[in-house]
């Protein structure tokens, strides 16, 4: 069987031959790098292209992101239902990539037509938001459905065991690595030097290249579908599996919620530009990829559920670390941007500051996905269906997190309460998994009480005490989350150059931006928007305003 398995094969005196999948593993990793690169190029181009139709407000961006991720979620669920496991996974993957490239080119033609339809039917309020969603669905759902189906398709190329499924974490990590490259390539080179049409052609060429390589590999590695095994799931209760789905959904919710909150705060510090967004996204994706690779390695252990629970609990500290660094440390680094001889020098400093803040938490979010896969795996499972469910749960959480934090939490509660909510969500996710682990160990203890202590990471009493201590630390982190400095809202990245701070009469955070009103000792009042002075009561400004 052409499947990924690390179990030795008995072959007498003949040398052991590597299974085809293991032999082609480097090529498969490269395929996922190319797939991720093309996907992020499309995402950046489509966002800019469709914003010309429905606008660039926070609500429009939320609709765009929700449609994009919703399509990927549906694709991950639908492929296992409509594509038989008997089909060669690599051929299915190649067909998906070729179709993505073709649809990517079609979007260039369809979007201008959607623009004429949108402007001809002006609709306001909730109906207008729904109308924008319909237009986004028409443009983005077909290609994003196929994008979401790629990982479940290739998942059938591995065995449904913790060791086999752990390789999916490496595939996921390589896909994210390609996404980082695509993000940087599109944001800093292709769109700057060329235009959206040329950039789309590059992404489509990558898709077609990946499809060609995948098809060639499928001819050299024949596939025989897995033989269904009797279900031996007594120890894997439905409640325990559902707990993993809930936890990975909450993990996706907190990850995208944090990206919304931290993008708002870091944009104050680094400046609101496409380069800042690309830097934040690239650093976040690098950390996710590193975490996914680490999680894939850890997933081979006998306790992936325990590892998942601890990763979620450690996220409470990671979010608290980012909140502290963004509010109390990074804005006050003695850096004067006006002294930089080149924007590229400033970009290097920005990368360092973003990494210091978000890297720890993003690594833990990246590790959670392969750990969740290994936590629900069973010998009788269809690997494609398994990956589809976990991926869908994570994506649904991500969609909810993006919408909830961008439309409700930040505008109405503020970024500080948003970060507190993120810590609480991570704590809840950890407690859900810890409860499932405890129930499973209680069942094991009835049959093999001694094995339970020797095979776990730590004895049960010590593990319980550590979990309680971690929960207490998380609650302390919720209370200790600091407020955003008023000076950061007022002066942004130039805050270190203002040694004498004015009196702040008002500071607020809205759905699109953060604003402040300050009064200097001389009585002059300034109106600040997103770290810049937009108006003042000085006579020379009053004549121009």
Name these PLM-found stretches.
Residues 2-545:
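Alpha-helical transmembrane segments of multi-pass membrane proteins
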């Amino acid at each position: 069987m052409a499947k990924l398995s690390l179990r030795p094969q008995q072959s007498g005196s003949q040398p052991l031959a590597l299974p085809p999948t293991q032999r082609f593993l480097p090529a498969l990793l490269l395929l996922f790098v190319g797939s991720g690169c093309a996907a992020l190029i499309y995402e950046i181009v489509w966002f800019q292209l469709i914003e010309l139709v429905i606008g660039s407000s926070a609500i429009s961006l939320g609709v765009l992101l929700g449609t994009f991720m919703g399509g990927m979620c549906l694709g991950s669920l639908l492929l296992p239902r409509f594509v038989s496991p008997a089909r060669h996974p690599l051929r299915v993957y190649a067909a998906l990539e070729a179709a993505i490239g073709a649809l990517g080119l079609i979007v260039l033609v369809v979007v201008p037509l959607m623009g004429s339809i949108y402007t001809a039917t002006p609709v306001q309020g909730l109906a207008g938001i729904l109308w924008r969603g319909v237009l986004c669905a028409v443009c983005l759902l077909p290609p994003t459905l196929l994008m979401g189906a790629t990982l479940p398709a290739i998942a059938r190329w591995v065995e449904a065991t913790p060791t086999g499924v752990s390789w999916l974490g490496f595939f996921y990590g390589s896909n994210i690595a390609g996404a980082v490259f695509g993000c940087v390539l599109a944001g800093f080179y292709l769109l700057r030097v060329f235009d959206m049409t040329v950039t789309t052609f590059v992404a489509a060429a990558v898709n077609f290249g990946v499809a060609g390589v995948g098809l060639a590999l499928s001819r050299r590695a024949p596939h025989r579908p897995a033989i269904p095994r009797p279900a031996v799931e007594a120890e894997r209760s439905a409640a325990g599996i559902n707990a993993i789905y809930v936890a990975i959904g909450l993990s996706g919710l907190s990850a995208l919620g944090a990206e919304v909150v931290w993008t708002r705060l870091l944009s104050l510090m680094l400046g609101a530009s496409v380069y800042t967004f690309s830097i934040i996204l690239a650093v976040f994706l690098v950390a996710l990829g590193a975490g996914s690779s680490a999680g894939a390695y850890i997933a081979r252990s006998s306790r992936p559920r325990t590892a998942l629970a601890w990763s979620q609990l450690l996220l409470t500290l990671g979010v608290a670390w980012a909140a502290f660094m963004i509010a109390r440390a990074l804005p006050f680094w003695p850096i004067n941007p006006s002294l930089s001889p080149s924007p590229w020098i400033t970009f290097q400093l920005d990368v360092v500051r973003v990494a210091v803040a978000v890297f720890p938490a993003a690594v833990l979010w990246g590790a959670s996905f392969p750990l969740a896969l290994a936590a629900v795996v069973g010998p009788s499972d269809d690997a494609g269906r398994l990956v589809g469910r976990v991926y869908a749960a994570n994506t649904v959480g991500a969609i909810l997190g993006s919408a909830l934090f961008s439309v409700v939490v930040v505008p109405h509660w503020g970024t500080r309460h948003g970060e507190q909510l993120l810590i609480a969500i991570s704590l809840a996710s950890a407690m859900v998994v810890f409860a499932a682990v405890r129930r499973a160990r209680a069942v094991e203890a009835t049959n093999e009480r001694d094995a339970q202590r020797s095979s776990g990471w730590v004895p049960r009493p010590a593990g319980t005490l550590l979990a309680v201590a971690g929960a207490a630390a998380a609650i302390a982190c919720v209370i200790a989350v600091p407020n955003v400095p008023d000076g950061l809202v007022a002066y942004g990245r130039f805050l270190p150059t203002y040694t004498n701070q004015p009196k702040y009469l008002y500071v607020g955070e809205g759905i699109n931006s953060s604003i402040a009103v300050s009064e200097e000792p001389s009585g002059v009042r300034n109106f600040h928007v997103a770290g810049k002075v937009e108006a003042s009561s000085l006579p020379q400004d009053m004549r121009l305003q």
